[in-house]
Design a protein with these regions (language model features):
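A domain-start/cap signature at the N-terminus of enzymes
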Residues: 17-62, 110, 136-148, 199, ...
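Cell-envelope and extracellular/periplasmic
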Residues: 65-71, 123-126, 138, 145, ...
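Short substrate-entry loop that stabilizes the transition state in hydrolases
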Residues: 52-104, 188-191
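Gly/Ser-rich "nucleophile elbow"/oxyanion-hole loop immediately N-terminal to the catalytic nucleophile
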Residues: 50-59, 104-140, 150-153
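Short, solvent-exposed loop/turn and secondary-structure capping segments
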Residues: 57-58, 73-78, 106-108, 147, ...
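Bacterial N-terminal signal peptides
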Residues: 4-15
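The feature captures the conserved acid-bearing segment of alpha/beta-hydrolase catalytic domains
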Residues: 157-230
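Structural recognition of the beta-strand scaffold that forms the well-ordered cores
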Residues: 62-66, 93-98, 132-137, 157-162, ...
Length: 280
């Protein structure tokens, strides 16, 4: 009997211990003080991805999301437009502000400093990286999504603006920051402004990718615009050098030298190029 008990205990001791379940996503917020009259305490919602481990050695990349004008921020990090699932897959922390007016899309006045303060809090708590930032915005949020990177290009890796009506002045400082501009061609006024900005960037040596969507009004098509944005961030964040180029308008993927500079979209990877060529 004693031998049987000993054998049982030995087998039990050697049995593999079930792995602890991966931590669930966490959605919460931090607040920072500002001097803006309508934003004395600016709130920033954040979402830690599924399986997050603050003790890991590699710092978490951050994607800053700007929704429509005066958006709450919480829906943006909680799954709106599909960013939560993408963040889980790629190990990205989502951050979205709750700004109210005070020209918050202009970062030089006050909102840029507020964002940096919030990111510093998250870096101290969770090990997020204050550099290599990604920015995405649509409609009014698309203004902030390109104006913030232009304010501090040294902190930004890539940005995407969809259906935008206000852009920054292209400068040499943005040459190392990847950008993607998208718009529905039925969103006539924003389409013209977006295309004019892309032309100006390329004339000044700032590479920006462009994609329009036929017969799309002022909306955010999930499968095409958002799918392309997510693939763009993934390709750029991989660190791969740009290996593919597309020709605006014909949507053909060609050798770089065969495309006139004014129509040349940097597409980085074959997977991104295929999605750009035939957006789903």
């Amino acid at each position: 009997m004693r031998g049987g008990l000993t054998a049982f205990l030995l087998v039990a001791a050697l049995a593999p211990v079930p792995a602890a379940p991966a931590p669930e996503p966490v959605v919460a917020s931090v607040e920072v003080a500002t001097r803006a009259p309508n934003n004395p305490r600016a709130k920033f919602w954040y979402r830690l991805p599924r399986g997050h481990d603050p003790a890991r050695r590699e710092r978490w990349r951050v994607l800053v999301l700007f929704g429509g004008r005066n958006c709450d921020g919480r829906p943006e990090v909680s799954g709106k437009l599909g960013w939560a699932a993408w963040a889980d897959l790629n190990g990205v922390v989502l951050v979205a502000p709750t700004f109210r007016d005070d020209a918050y899309w202009e970062p030089r006045a006050w909102s840029g400093r507020a964002l940096l303060d919030a990111l510093a809090v998250l870096a101290a708590r969770f090990g997020t990286s204050p550099r290599g930032l990604l920015f995405y915005g649509y409609s009014a949020g698309s203004q902030a999504a390109n104006l913030f990177p232009a304010w501090r290009p040294d902190l930004c890796r890539a940005w995407v603006s969809h259906a935008c009506g206000v852009f920054h002045e292209p400068s040499a400082g943005m040459r190392g920051v990847a950008g993607l501009v998208t718009c529905g061609d039925a969103d006539a006024a924003r389409y013209v402004l977006s295309r004019r900005f892309v032309d100006l960037c390329r004339a000044r040596g700032v590479p920006v990718a462009w994609r329009s969507f036929p017969n799309r009004p002022h909306d955010v098509p999930e499968a095409s615009a958002l799918g392309l944005a997510r693939a763009f961030f993934g390709a750029v964040a991989s660190g791969a050098p740009c290996a593919c180029w597309g020709e605006d308008g014909t949507w053909r993927v060609l050798e770089r030298e065969r495309i006139d500079p004014e129509y040349r979209s940097p597409l980085y990877t074959p997977a991104l190029a295929e999605l750009w060529r035939r957006p789903r």
